[in-house]
């Protein structure tokens, strides 16, 4: 009797998956206890036939339909009952690749973009270029509007109609094997996810400002710990976030349908994907626009600190570029090159990568709390004392160092104010002033009704002044006659005045007499007249920034700035008004790539 009950239970498990505690489609199990399977080696290009297959596969012969839902004609047949004996047809002569104009033309295009001699012949240099490790995404893809194949929605609709017809003709539904049930479930899930992705996009880019990503549970690699894998992916997403107005957040709790980008590792036929990996040595990974990223676990991926193997960080950054909408860029230094170029862990996104992604998503914009040039003295290699400066931008609780020679922020910024500037308020600084003369050298941060003096040598705020008075101090005590809170401030070395901005007024504070200068305050509109009519911030300035790079003063308000007419400008054009304001411009047009990152990525 017990054996009969056991048999019935087993049958129910096969027929009804819900009765069984089966393994989830996506789970979080660490597979480090499993023995890795033998690594397969990718087939190399070595002759005309394999070269022809390579050119066709990557879109050089003609653009390729790159669609995760496309069927793979080479997929092994699962139902052998459908096999039929083939019909014998007369043998047809196949043209040799070397005589095909299409093959020669494709070969020439490949050679040209890979900086090879354009010969149209399959020489050793061309074969070597084809055998370089690369991304699995085709170099030339067919535009969606050019494809005539049914979409995933149409395919699923047709499958549904066929199923309805069968149900109507056969009242008793056929028994579905459990494997086929899972296949249909995964297909419908993928269709739903694709439809949601279409709703998120305009057809070209994500329209959401916050994208969520996740490593799918089945797709962890055996080669690195789970924490190492997640760290690398967080860093790769941060690299893109530093140069574009999108945030990325790892989300391991929301339903899978709400995840924008899913990442995973696999070998050969993997993760329900229609594109099989080829083994070690050639394709490292592939990705889909607004979709998933898969990594070939036959490859030897390593952490950024390793000098050996394949940098998972570099491959991940490349594939994320595809998901965001970038194609391959045939430019030395670009992360979007199709071929993997071994490089140290210090690589960063090239100018071409940054401009390409900003062409899709726009540049980073936003107001700032303060901006300033930090002046300091140090000895050079000859022991001589030299004066240098670094440029900083503050926003909320973050700061960026701006590298003026490269016209971009320092790689790895922003950083938390609390970590870089010790003893001052950790967010929403109102202004910074550096009083720098032959006899004085003092730096001040202002917030609310108080100010802090900063010790640049010890990199922290002073606890007290020379008279033993503690910091922070009231602005009204240290700068008599100046109201608080202030909007912005800067120091004019020529006149030795600190100019404080509050609402629609500007105050000139004489540092030698420790008082407000005569005839002040004045209206900002009068003290800084507009060069062009009706083009003036009028009041509530965010930042007053004197730049030593441009030898000019800039007034920031919101996302825009006004450059103050300099002495050099007046020498070139005497008709310009003294302290006049040139017409507004976007801050992002003068200072590039000052981008926020998601708080979860701030500590990387």
From Swiss-Prot:
Its EC number is 3.4.24.-. It is found in: Secreted. A motif (Cysteine switch) lies at residues 133-140. Hemopexin repeats lie at residues 365-424, 426-482, 483-531, 538-594. GO terms for biological process: collagen catabolic process; determination of heart left/right asymmetry; determination of left/right symmetry; extracellular matrix organization; proteolysis. Binds 1 zinc ion per subunit. One of its GO terms (molecular function) is zinc ion binding. InterPro entries: Hemopexin-like_dom_sf, Hemopexin-like_repeat, M10A_MMP, MetalloPept_cat_dom_sf, Pept_M10_metallopeptidase, Pept_M10A, Peptidase_Metallo, Peptidoglycan-bd-like. Zn(2+) binds at residues 135, 318, 322, 328. The precursor is cleaved by a furin endopeptidase. Disulfide bonds join 364-595. Pfam families: Hemopexin, Peptidase_M10, PG_binding_1. Residues 1-22 form the signal peptide. It is an enzyme of class 3 (hydrolase). Residues 132-175 are annotated as: Disordered. GO terms for cellular component: extracellular matrix; extracellular region. Its cofactor is Zn(2+); Ca(2+). Keywords: Calcium, Cleavage on pair of basic residues, Disulfide bond, Glycoprotein, Hydrolase, Metal-binding, Metalloprotease, Protease, Repeat, Secreted, Signal, Zinc, Zymogen. The active site is at residue 319. Glycans are attached at residues 158, 165, 404, 407. Residues 23-180 form a propeptide. Its main location: secreted. The conserved cysteine present in the cysteine-switch motif binds the catalytic zinc ion, thus inhibiting the enzyme. The dissociation of the cysteine from the zinc ion upon the activation-peptide release activates the enzyme. PANTHER family: MATRIX METALLOPROTEINASE, MATRIX METALLOPROTEINASE-21. Plays a specialized role in the generation of left-right asymmetry during embryogenesis. May act as a negative regulator of the NOTCH-signaling pathway. This is Matrix metalloproteinase-21.
């Amino acid at each position: 009797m017990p054996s009969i009950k056991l048999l019935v239970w087993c049958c129910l498990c096969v027929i009804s998956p819900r009765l069984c505690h089966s393994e989830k489609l996506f789970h979080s199990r660490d597979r480090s206890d499993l023995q890795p399977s033998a690594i397969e080696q990718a087939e190399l290009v070595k002759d005309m036939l394999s070269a022809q297959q390579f050119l066709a596969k990557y879109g050089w012969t003609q653009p390729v339909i790159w669609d995760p839902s496309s069927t793979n004609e080479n997929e092994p047949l699962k139902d052998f009952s459908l096999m039929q004996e083939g019909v014998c047809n007369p043998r047809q002569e196949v043209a040799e690749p070397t005589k095909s104009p299409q093959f020669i033309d494709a070969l020439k295009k490949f050679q040209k973009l890979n900086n090879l001699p354009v010969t149209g012949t399959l020489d050793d240099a061309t074969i070597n270029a084809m055998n370089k490790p690369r991304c699995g995404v085709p170099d030339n893809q067919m535009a969606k509007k050019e494809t005539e194949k049914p979409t995933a929605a149409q395919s699923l609709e047709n499958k549904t109609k066929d199923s309805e017809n069968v149900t109507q003709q056969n009242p008793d539904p056929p028994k579905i094997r459990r494997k086929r049930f899972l296949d249909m479930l995964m297909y419908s899930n993928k269709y739903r996810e694709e439809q949601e992705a279409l709703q998120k996009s305009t057809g070209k880019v994500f329209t959401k400002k916050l994208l969520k990503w996740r490593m799918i549970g089945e797709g962890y690699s055996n080669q690195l710990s789970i924490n190492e894998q997640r760290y690398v992916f967080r860093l790769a997403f941060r690299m893109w976030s530093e140069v574009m107005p999108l945030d990325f957040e790892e989300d391991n709790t929301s339903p899978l349908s709400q995840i924008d980008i899913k990442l995973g590792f696999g070998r050969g036929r993997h993760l329900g994907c229609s594109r099989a990996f080829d083994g070690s040595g050639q394709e490292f990974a592939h990705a889909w626009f607004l979709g998933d990223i898969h990594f070939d676990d036959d490859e030897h991926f390593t952490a950024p600190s390793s000098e050996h193997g394949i940098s998972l960080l570099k491959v991940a950054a490349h594939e994320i570029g595809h998901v965001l909408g970038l194609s391959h860029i045939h430019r030395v230094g670009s992360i979007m090159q199709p071929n993997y170029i071994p490089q140290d862990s210090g690589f960063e996104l090239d100018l071409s990568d940054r401009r390409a992604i900003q062409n899709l998503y726009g540049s980073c914009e936003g107001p700032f709390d303060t901006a300033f040039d930090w002046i300091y003295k140090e000895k050079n290699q000859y022991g001589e004392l030299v004066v240098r400066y670094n440029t900083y931008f503050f926003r909320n609780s973050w700061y960026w160092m701006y590298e003026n020679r490269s016209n971009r922020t320092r790689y790895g910024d922003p950083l938390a104010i609390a970590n870089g500037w010790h003893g001052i308020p950790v967010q929403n600084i109102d202004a910074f002033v550096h009083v720098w003369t032959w006899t004085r050298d003092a730096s001040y941060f202002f917030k609310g009704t108080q100010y802090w003096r900063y010790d640049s040598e010890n990199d922290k705020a002073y606890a007290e002044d020379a008279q033993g008075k503690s910091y922070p101090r009231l602005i009204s005590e240290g700068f008599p006659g100046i109201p608080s809170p202030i909007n912005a401030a800067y120091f004019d070395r020529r006149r030795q005045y600190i100019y404080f901005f509050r609402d629609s007024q500007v105050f000139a504070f004489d540092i030698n007499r420790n008082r407000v200068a005569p005839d002040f305050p004045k209206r900002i509109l009068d003290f800084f007249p507009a060069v062009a009519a009706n083009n003036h911030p009028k009041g509530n300035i965010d930042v007053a920034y004197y730049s030593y790079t441009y030898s000019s003063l800039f007034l920031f308000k919101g996302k825009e700035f006004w450059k103050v007419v300099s002495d050099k400008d007046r020498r070139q054009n005497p008709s310009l008004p003294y302290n006049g304001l040139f017409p507004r411009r976007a801050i992002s047009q003068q200072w590039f790539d000052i981008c926020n990152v998601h708080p979860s990525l701030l500590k990387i």
